[in-house]
Amino acid sequence: MITVKAKKEKVDDVKAFLSNAVNLAREEKETITWYSFQIDESTFGIFDTFEDESGREAHLNGKIAKALMENAPELLAEEPSIKKIDVMSSK
């Protein structure tokens, strides 16, 4: 899971980035689910799931992560918070 804090003047750009990133996620065969969400006015997140650790690592080294890190200085007020989580149960 990742959370990002957009610069106040870049909120719309971060929304657009995340909305468009789903197309890159669809290309990742090992990414099972991918969601972007908004927490408050300028805080956003991505929640995604993978079949196994190799899928997670492929994603973390993939196009979305690369684009986010390249654009982070321009778009984000602080470094992204990336946490590896394991789903314990689901419905």
Where are these regions (language model features)?
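Short, conserved charged micro-motifs
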Residues: 9-13
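An amphipathic, aromatic/His-enriched active-site/gating alpha helix that lines ligand/cofactor pockets
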Residues: 20, 24-33, 49-83
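A short acidic, often aromatic-flanked loop/helix-cap motif at beta-alpha or helix-coil junctions
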Residues: 88-91
